[in-house]
Every structure is written in structure tokens, then in C-alpha cells.
């Protein structure tokens, strides 16, 4: 395995670790509605940071974006909006299925759809099947899916042992939402694929290869921001128990506390895709679809590790922890299989 591919896998791991941890600051926010908290963090992660980073990277910010036709920008934007819909469904999936089953089904579907649909859309899936390296990477995707399933099973055992139940368990409704979440969340993978002309244009302007994907986030996350912020603002306006004015009428010190924590959560959310771009850069072009598989499987891996570090599994007993550890090992093996396949 080449050093470049190894570093690509490493940066995907760092990005996934940030994704697994980003919600921790949000949990410390006090006396704010979820909608206000999510909006403040979202403005930072989906608007301020993508625009600021792009302004630093590009020699002429406006000239870069105005150089693209609507036919180039619109698919990127719409796939970003597609991801935004999946993002909202994610929370509802947890509500009706519980954390473990919800995450397992949603992540499993988005891993498959986001990883395999890209080469199918590009018309080169047959090349993957017909080459040794391609077959190896596809095997890695299958092993990663097995690893996600094992970690999901560990979560179910933990919830059963600790008496944790879904907020409003509804299998039929939860499964529909999980499938929708999995499919729509893959929009981020499709957006990255559609944004290749933007990456190439950034490279032509002299942007470092590690950073060429970052300017496209202005458009991708702009689509996601409209969906997420629109959802939050509509609820803040329509739901009687929610009030943006009330949330910002608290003591000044508490408002500052909440804004800082929401900003930190937004920064950590953005960093997952900052490092996703770094991890994506050294991946060979014919295997760029693998980036999504690495990100999602590492997200599950890091989520399990973070849970152990935060002692969330202390009262779960030995069996759930053993199953979790097995799942984490399987995901690590999957990453190595994919790396070897890409090296071939």
C-alpha cells in the first residue's frame, strides 16, 4: 500500500472521528431549543466556514464561482439539498427505532448507496468487477458493511441490558425513515462526484491538491443549509412551545455559553468534511467512490470508540463490549482490504 493511499485512509479516519464527536458540545447547551442550537451550529458549519475557507484558498472568489454554468452548479447544489433531507430524517429515525437499530440501518444503506451508485452512474462499475483491485475494494465494502452490522448488534445488546428504548418505537414508520435517511444522506457522496469540474478548476488555479474539494462545499453545504435551516426556522415560527426570541432572552452569560458551544459543535461538524477532502485527494481516480465507504464505516468505528472512552458502555456487561470490539476490528480489516485493493 502506497504512502499516499495510507495517508488518505488516515485523514478519512480523522474526519470520521470529528464526526463521531461533534455532537458532544451540543449536549452541553442549556435552555435552548434543539432548533435554535442546530441553526447556530449550522450557520457556522454550512455557511461561515465553507465561505471563509474558500475565500482564503481562491485567488478570486467571485470569478471562480461565476465561471461555472448553471448546469454544473445545479446538480451539486441539489445533491447537497438531498443530503440535507437525509440529515433531518436521521434524527426522526433515532426517534422511532432507537439509536442502535436506527444508526445501523441508516448508515448501512447510505454506505451501500453512496459507495456503489457513484461508479454505476459514471458507467465504470463493470471495470471494478473485472479487475483484481476493483474486486478487492468491493470486498472491502462488503466487509465494512458486516462490521457496521456487528457494531449495530452490540448497540442493541447494550440497549437491552441497560433498558434503553426508542422514544416512540414504531417499526414500520422507523424503517421507512431509515431507508429514506440512508438514500438521501448519500447525496453528499453524489455531490462530491458532481463537483469534480469544480475540483479541477480549483487545481488549475494553483490550489493545493489537498484543498481542491473545499471550494465546492460552498455550493454543496449551501444546498444542505437551506433544507436544515428552513426546517428549523419553520418549526421555530409554527410550533407554539418554540421561540427564537425566548432562547435569546436568557442571561447574557448563558447565551454566550450556548453560542460558543454551538459554534464549537459546528466547527467539529465542518472538520469531518475538511479532512474528508484531504482523505479524498490521494485516492486513485478509479477508486474515488471508496471515500464514502471509508468515511461512513470509520464514523461507526469512532462512534463505538468514543462511547467506550466516555464510559457509556460501563454498565452494559462484557458481551456487548466484546461484540462492539469485534465489529471495530472488522471495520479496520475492511479499511486495509480497500487500501490493498486501491494499491493494486
Swiss-Prot record:
Tell me the first and last residues of the signal peptide.
none
Give the reaction(s) catalysed.
L-rhamnopyranose(in) + H(+)(in) = L-rhamnopyranose(out) + H(+)(out)
Instruction: From the record, give the transmembrane residue ranges.
Output: 4-24, 38-58, 68-88, 101-121, 137-157, 175-195, 214-234, 259-279, 290-310, 323-343
Name the membrane topology term.
Multi-pass membrane protein
**Where does this chain mainly localize?**
membrane
SS bond partners? none
What are the UniProt keywords, alphabetically?
Answer: Cell inner membrane, Cell membrane, Membrane, Sugar transport, Symport, Transmembrane, Transmembrane helix, Transport
According to the UniProt entry, its GO molecular function terms are:
rhamnose transmembrane transporter activity; symporter activity
- Cellular localisation: Cell inner membrane
Per its UniProt record, what Pfam families does this chain match? RhaT
What top-level branch of life does the organism fall under? Bacteria
Q: Which InterPro entries match?
A: L-rhamnose-proton_sym_RhaT (IPR004673)
Function in brief:
Uptake of L-rhamnose across the cytoplasmic membrane with the concomitant transport of protons into the cell (symport system).
Instruction: Family membership, please give it.
Output: Belongs to the L-rhamnose transporter (TC 2.A.7.6) family.
Protein name (Swiss-Prot/TrEMBL): L-rhamnose-proton symporter
Amino acid at each position: 500500500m502506497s504512502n499516499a493511499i495510507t495517508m488518505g485512509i488516515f485523514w478519512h479516519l480523522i474526519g470520521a472521528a470529528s464526526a463521531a464527536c461533534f455532537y458532544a458540545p451540543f449536549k452541553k447547551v442549556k435552555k435552548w431549543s434543539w432548533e435554535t442550537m442546530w441553526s447556530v451550529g449550522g450557520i457556522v458549519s454550512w455557511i461561515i466556514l465553507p465561505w471563509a475557507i474558500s475565500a482564503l484558498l481562491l485567488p478570486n472568489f467571485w470569478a471562480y464561482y461565476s465561471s461555472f454554468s448553471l448546469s454544473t452548479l445545479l446538480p451539486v447544489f441539489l445533491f447537497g439539498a438531498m443530503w440535507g433531507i437525509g440529515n433531518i430524517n436521521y434524527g426522526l429515525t433515532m426517534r422511532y427505532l432507537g439509536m442502535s437499530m436506527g444508526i445501523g440501518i441508516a448508515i448501512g444503506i447510505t454506505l451501500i448507496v453512496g459507495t456503489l451508485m457513484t461508479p454505476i452512474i459514471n458507467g465504470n462499475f463493470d471495470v471494478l468487477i473485472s479487475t483484481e483491485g476493483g474486486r478487492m475494494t468491493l470486498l472491502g465494502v462488503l466487509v465494512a458493511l458486516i462490521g457496521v452490522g456487528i457494531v449495530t448488534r452490540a448497540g442493541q445488546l447494550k440497549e437491552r441490558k441497560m433498558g434503553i428504548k426508542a422514544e416512540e418505537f414504531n417499526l414500520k414508520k422507523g424503517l421507512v425513515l431509515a431507508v429514506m435517511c440512508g438514500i438521501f444522506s448519500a447525496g453528499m457522496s453524489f455531490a462530491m462526484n458532481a463537483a469534480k469540474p469544480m475540483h479541477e478548476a480549483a487545481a488549475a488555479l494553483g490550489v493545493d491538491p489537498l484543498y481542491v474539494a473545499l471550494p465546492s462545499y460552498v455550493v454543496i453545504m449551501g444546498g444542505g443549509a437551506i433544507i436544515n435551516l428552513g426546517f428549523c426556522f419553520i418549526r421555530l415560527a409554527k410550533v407554539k412551545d418554540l421561540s427564537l426570541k425566548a432562547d435569546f432572552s436568557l442571561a447574557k452569560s448563558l447565551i454566550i455559553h450556548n453560542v460558543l458551544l454551538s459554534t464549537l459543535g459546528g466547527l467539529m461538524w465542518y472538520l469531518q468534511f475538511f479532512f474528508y477532502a484531504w482523505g479524498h485527494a490521494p485516492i486513485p481516480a478509479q477508486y474515488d467512490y471508496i471515500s464514502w465507504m471509508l468515511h461512513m464505516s470509520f464514523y461507526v468505528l469512532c462512534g463505538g470508540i468514543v462511547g467506550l472512552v466516555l464510559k457509556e458502555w460501563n454498565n452494559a456487561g462484557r458481551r456487548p463490549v466484546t461484540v462492539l470490539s469485534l465489529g471495530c476490528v472488522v471495520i479496520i480489516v475492511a479499511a486495509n482490504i480497500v487500501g490493498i485493493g486501491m494499491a493494486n
